[in-house]
């Protein structure tokens, strides 16, 4: 069943809202917690921290140049839609970094507790990355390289691909910054990779749903049009009443199975 133009438009708008919010979360983690502590978990932002330390070039300028080059690779190997959404993410992140540098300049870390800063420097970008991957986008940079590796090699986990692509940047931190910063960065990279996989796994987790109903048409229509999911149905009979029913089988995420969605159904149903 075809999806209407309005529904397609709403899906696209929703996707780009998620991308924009995810990038904002990532930028806050990177600018306020990662850059001031010289944490290098890899990626273009990690390279930006190294470049900003060694040269007069700003982090935002380096990020712009590197992301453009990697975006071209994304277009070639991962497709047009991925490149466009990642390009939007790159533009938003570059703009937000430039705004923070101009209006909220930092002379040092926000706190005197590196471990506390490390928690936020890991958690915010990792959660944001998982949200981006879940909608078929990325923040650009070495995330693009990681997704190319995952697509064209035998790697099954996004976190594993991220770890491999970002490891070189962390090793470089050993020579640019002090040993403690390098150790913090290595711990951060490892935990970030695990968090990305954990969040992605949770978001993609689906449950098999059996729906017993008398009228299959509105429910199948709802599942296919509103939730954009497939469904299979078969006639069945109640063991106690011997009345005929339909049993519909589908898979839904926790959000899709929530009361907010199922309450829209008008037909009496039994969901298990």
Sequence positions of predicted segments:
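Intrinsic disorder/low-complexity segments
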Residues: 1, 228, 267-270
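Core subunits and conserved enzymes of cellular information-processing
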Residues: 2-215
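Cytosolic, membrane-proximal regulatory domains of ion/volume homeostasis and mechanosensation machinery
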Residues: 11, 192, 196, 200-209, ...
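Single conserved hydrophobic/aromatic residue that forms the stacking wall/gate
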Residues: 260-272
């Amino acid at each position: 069943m075809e999806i209407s133009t309005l529904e397609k438009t709403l899906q696209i708008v929703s996707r780009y809202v998620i991308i924009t919010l995810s990038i904002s979360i990532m930028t806050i983690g990177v600018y306020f917690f990662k850059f001031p502590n010289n944490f290098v978990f890899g990626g273009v932002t990690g390279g930006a921290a190294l470049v900003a330390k060694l040269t007069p070039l700003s982090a935002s300028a380096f990020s712009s140049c590197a992301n453009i080059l990697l975006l071209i690779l994304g277009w070639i190997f991962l497709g047009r839609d991925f490149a466009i959404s990642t390009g939007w993410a790159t533009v938003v992140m570059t703009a937000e970094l430039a705004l923070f540098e101009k209006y909220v300049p930092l002379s040092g870390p926000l706190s005197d507790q590196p471990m506390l800063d490390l928690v936020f420097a890991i958690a915010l970008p990792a959660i944001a990355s998982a949200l981006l991957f879940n909608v078929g986008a990325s923040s650009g940079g070495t995330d693009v390289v990681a997704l190319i590796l995952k697509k064209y090699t035998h790697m099954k986990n996004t976190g594993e691909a991220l770890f491999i692509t970002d490891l070189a940047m962390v090793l470089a931190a050993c020579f640019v910054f002090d040993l403690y910063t390098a150790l913090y960065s290595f711990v951060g990279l490892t935990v970030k990779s695990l968090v990305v996989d954990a969040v992605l796994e949770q978001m993609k987790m689906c449950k098999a749903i059996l729906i017993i109903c008398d009228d299959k048409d509105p429910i199948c229509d709802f599942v296919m049009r509103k939730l954009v999911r497939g469904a299979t149905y078969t006639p069945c009979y109640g063991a106690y009443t011997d009345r005929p029913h339909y049993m519909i089988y589908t898979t839904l995420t926790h959000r899709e199975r929530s009361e907010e969605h199922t309450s829209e159904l008008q037909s009496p149903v039994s969901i298990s």
